Amino acid sequence: MKFNRKKMIWIIFGVIIAIIIVIITCYMIVECKASGKTYDMVADVPHREVGLLLGTSPRTPENAPNYYFINRITAIAELYKAGKIDKVIASGGDYSSRPGGGYDELVAMRDSLIDHGIPDSVIILDYDGTRTLNSIVKAKEVYGEDCITLISQKYHNERAIYLASQQGIDAIGYNAKPSHIITKRIKNEGREFLARVKLFVDMILGEKPQFESKKK
């Protein structure tokens, strides 16, 4: 069979276009679902009993301060001091045993929250929050919370709101500021396109959350 180079080019082009369409479609479905459910101003946020703080590392791989972490802490402190939430579920993971040194997200979050004036007595630590899906579902099934305010950057809040809607959870999001470092913003927001595709792939494959079915 004679190789048809022109036909192959068109096939490759078609595949690329199809992939782009899938990526954009997944992104827009999530964004539309979250429309009107995220807030940039603390005064506009409705009161919810619980704020779910989605974890991230306190330091970057270069051991510099992670402004995504810092800004999430600042955001949840703003909510608490404004009376918009009464307690905090800090959801993340313990990576302190990683080779070469790691970190415990929960300890870092708790200490930072206390430093920002949030009492230890209203902070709940969830060590199963290694995935957004785990954090969302555990908030409902273990902690009994089906009406929550999510705290993360806007793109992450939108995806978390979509996940929450699929689990019967009424979620809104308060948007922490992104990093002021442009390269970090481009990297993280670019990765979000693929994260939203993975969200739908996981749904199609029936991916289940994994967490301990008890409070700590």
Regions found by a protein language model. Give the residues of each.
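Enrichment for repetitive, rod-forming helical segments
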Residues: 13-17, 79, 203-205
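A transmembrane-helix-recognition feature enriched in membrane-embedded lipid enzymes
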Residues: 186-208
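N-terminal type II signal-anchor transmembrane helix
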Residues: 2-43
